[in-house]
Each structure stands twice: as C-alpha cells, then as structure tokens.
C-alpha cells in the first residue's frame, strides 16, 4: 500500500454523504473501502489516528493506505481533493457563528469529490425518489450491464486477490 497522512478526511462520512455511490465498505474487511471512478479502482483504509491542534480547533491526523498502482495515486489525490486545505476552510468559519461552527465540525471528514461529470449527472437522475442503498444497487446494475469489465489485483492481508469490477458506462 501507499501510505499518506491527511486531516479532515473520514472514509465513512464520505461514503455515506450521498455524494458518490461507488464507494462501499468491504464486507470482509471492515474499515476498508472500495472506490470506483471512471477506469480506476482503489481500496483505501484508515490505519492510524493522532490529534493535531490548530488555533482553537482539534483535528484528527489520520494515515490512509491507498491500495492502487503508484501511477494511479495522482488520480485519487485529485478525486479526493487532497491538495485543498480543509483545515483552513474550517478555521475560517467565524467563532461567533455557532451554527456554522457546528456544521463544519460535524462534516469535517467530508471532502468535495472531483467526479466524472457524466457519472455525476446520471447518478443524480437515478437518485430521485430513492435511498442511498437503492441508488448504489442501481448504479452497480447499470455498470455491470453497460460498463467495461476490468480486473485488478489488490493486497488483502498478505495475499493478492483479483477483483472484477465494471467502469461506469460512457456516453
């Protein structure tokens, strides 16, 4: 795995935010998530956590393990918006605005994902009148039916496992 430290990133918050529908926790490895975007597959997990103090705000400094090819890491860094300083955004909220302060802290692990516009529009259309689990099912069914099949080897414990997945269909 490729290890990278970040603050203001929580995999579960991102997966459950309704922002994307192809980020799911692996049933056989709690805390590890698979993410599919365009022609890319990633497995990612949080390994350790520490605390970082800035001004009056305390942030979790987390180390994440990216299970992908080195040449794909830059794609995922852009996807998760990792070049942006979310701590600075949260710290810029006025201290006397308790409502916004609370909102910033509650969602401090959510990042703005740089998703493929086509996939984002279609999943938005699919999302009307559905729950997040139903949207995920619909998106996966659409991808299996019309997307391109891929195979990727990922490290699971001490063994490599081949994963079969489908990219989201293109226009």
Give the label of every model feature segment:
Residues 1-171:
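HhH-family (HhH-GPD) DNA N-glycosylase catalytic core used in base-excision repair
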């Amino acid at each position: 795995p490729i290890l990278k430290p970040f603050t203001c990133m929580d995999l579960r918050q991102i997966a459950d935010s309704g922002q994307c529908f192809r980020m799911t926790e692996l049933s056989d490895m709690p805390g590890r998530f698979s993410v599919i975007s365009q022609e890319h597959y990633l497995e990612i997990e949080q390994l350790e956590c520490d605390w970082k103090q800035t001004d009056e705000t305390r942030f979790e400094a987390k180390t994440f393990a990216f299970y992908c090819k080195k040449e794909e890491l830059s794609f995922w860094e852009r996807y998760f918006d990792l070049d942006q300083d979310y701590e600075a955004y949260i710290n810029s909220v006025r201290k006397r605005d308790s409502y916004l302060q609370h909102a910033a802290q509650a969602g401090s692990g959510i990042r703005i994902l740089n998703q493929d516009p086509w996939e984002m529009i279609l999943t938005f259309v699919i999302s009307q009148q559905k729950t997040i689990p139903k949207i995920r099912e619909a998106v996966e069914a659409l991808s299996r039916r019309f997307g391109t099949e891929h195979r990727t080897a990922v490290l699971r414990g001490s063994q490599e496992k081949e994963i079969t997945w489908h990219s989201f269909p293109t226009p």
